[in-house]
Amino acid sequence: MSKVFVIILVALMVAISIASAHRPPPNPRCLPGHSKCKYEPKKNSCCLGFQCTERNQCELVYPGHHGKPCGKDNLLGCILPPPTFKPRPCGKYNLKGCKPIRPRPHPHH
């Protein structure tokens, strides 16, 4: 029983190594910090999953749950804070889905 399992495992590893050897080399624009790009707001000259920052470099974007808040440096591939969640203070990086916080009256001593 265990010998069959080992043979299947080895066959899988060999198949994976052959498949990965035929993959084309990664696009230099897909490597964070290595590729130069022209920064243009709302445009993306980098490959999918990357974005061009103001430093004219392609930076990795984390999609979905791990997305960075939207802001000056992150127009593409960013997530807006959900408005149903805790209200967050308005700021440079949080223009949508935020609520202005009213100053609380301090109790007098």
Curated annotation (Swiss-Prot):
Residues 1-21 form the signal peptide. The keyword Signal applies. Disulfide bonds join C30-C47, C37-C52, C46-C58, C70-C90, C78-C98. Expressed by the venom gland. Keywords: Disulfide bond, Knottin, Secreted, Signal. One of its GO terms (cellular component) is extracellular region. It is found in: Secreted. The presence of a 'disulfide through disulfide knot' structurally defines this protein as a knottin. This is Cysteine-rich venom protein 7.
